[in-house]
Amino acid sequence: MKPNIHPEYRTVVFHDTSIDEYFRIGSTIKTDRVIELDGVTYPYVTIDVSSKSHPFYTGKLRTVASEGNVARFTQRFGRFVDAKKGG
């Protein structure tokens, strides 16, 4: 292998902010932030969703912004659907 062309592989702490859980995973991601866990300093990255919080993996439904879009659509055009059903 050629020297000095591969990224540094190290243990990184990923913080799932939606459930406030920390994961120590090997990664090559670059970050300037650090965190100390169990007396050891690790590079630190925040994430919004992980396998522990994603609805597909948890089986739990979460409210999403698109539900507001559906409600807004129904409010605007729902009267046309009701008129067609009535006759």
From Swiss-Prot:
Keyword terms: Ribonucleoprotein, Ribosomal protein
Any single Pfam family the record assigns to this protein: Ribosomal_L31
Record GO cellular component, one term: ribonucleoprotein complex
Keyword Ribonucleoprotein: yes
InterPro entries: Ribosomal_bL28/bL31-like_sf (IPR034704), Ribosomal_bL31 (IPR002150), Ribosomal_bL31_B (IPR027493), Ribosomal_bL31_sf (IPR042105)
GO term, biological process aspect, one: translation
Single annotated GO MF: structural constituent of ribosome
Assembly description: Part of the 50S ribosomal subunit.
Family: Belongs to the bacterial ribosomal protein bL31 family. Type B subfamily.
Name of this chain's protein: Large ribosomal subunit protein bL31B-2/bL31B-3
UniProt organism field: Escherichia coli O157:H7
Gene transcribed to yield this protein: rpmE2-2
